[in-house]
Structure formats: C-alpha cells, structure tokens
Amino acid sequence: MIDKDKIREGMKLILEAIGEDANREGLIETPDRIARMYEEIFSGIGMNAKEHLSKTFEVHSNDLVLEKDITFYSMCEHHLVPFYGKVHIAYIPNGRVVGLSKLARCVEVYSKKPQLQERLTTEIADSIMEYLDAQGVMVVVEGEHMCMTMRGVRKPGAKTVTTTYRGKFLEDESLKNDVFRMISM
C-alpha cells in the first residue's frame, strides 16, 4: 500500500527545497530510511481492529476491565510530526472478554496512521463497543504533541487529554469516577 519510490522522490525534493544537498554523505540514504520508516509508522492505514478483537473468551462476570498506560506513538495529520503518550481503556464485558494484548493491538491499529488525538480516542472506543459487544467503554488518551513542543507556541510538556464514553459510562457518573481513580493509582 505504501509507495516507497514516491516517498523517496518526495523526500529528496524536500531536502533540496530546504537548501540541503540530498547527495551528501549524511543525507544520501535518508530518503530510503524515511520510506522504510513510513512503511512502519503508517502501517495502520486501511486496517481496522476487528482481526485483533474477534477472538474472545467467555467470562461469568460483567465487572469492569481496565488496561491502563498503553503507550502509543502517532503522527499528527496537520503537521506530520509525532504525538505520543498513553491510552487507558476501560470496558464492561457482556459475557466475553478479549486477551489484554489485543487492546494494545487495537491502539496500534488506530495510532499508526496520520491521525488526530480526538479521532484516535473515538476509533478505539467504537471498535471495542462493536467487536466486543461491550456494555460500556471508556477511553482516555493523554498525548504530548510535537507540533506544540518544537514549533508554534513551543510548550514542552503540555499534555492534551481526550476522553470518550459509550454505553453504561454515559449513564453512570460513579463508574467514570472509579476509572479515573484507578488510572491515577
């Protein structure tokens, strides 16, 4: 899906456009390195989390499941610079759960493409609701955006927090508060 030849050509043009010699020793292989890196960091393009969330296990409990501090890296679609941080996923099963590593895979699918943090948050929640048939989902994403750190307002350490709620989390404020308390532990 990734056209590495076009990326190489484009990267060489960018280097030349900023006044660099694209053929000098330190840069001559940069277009190829960027093409390989883009293949990896944009591997979520065209994917959805169904393959990771389709194998479930029966449980006889509908108690809350929280997977917190899932690290992620993504690329801001506005500036194509990284944003990164942590995702916290809480869900209430409907008689079935998924292996915990699959929640991290779900995060990877949606973070490995040009992305907005707000959309990342909702895509994760919507996929868990749909593929796990959960009674409720809450997703909290904490991200630091390099577009705010290294350019523009230049505010290193500023974090953006996005949340979304589905199902029972929309109805029960104490449930949300429980998750926020557990995240801060």
From Swiss-Prot:
Domain of life (superkingdom): Bacteria
Disulfide bonds: none
Pfam family name, one: GTP_cyclohydroI
Catalytic reaction annotation: GTP + H2O = 7,8-dihydroneopterin 3'-triphosphate + formate + H(+)
Zinc as UniProt keyword: yes
Pathway in which the depicted protein is active: Cofactor biosynthesis; 7,8-dihydroneopterin triphosphate biosynthesis; 7,8-dihydroneopterin triphosphate from GTP: step 1/1
Record carries keyword Cell membrane: no
Record-listed E.C. numbers: 3.5.4.16
Quaternary data: Toroid-shaped homodecamer, composed of two pentamers of five dimers.
The protein's name in its UniProt record: GTP cyclohydrolase 1
Organism: Clostridium perfringens (strain SM101 / Type A)
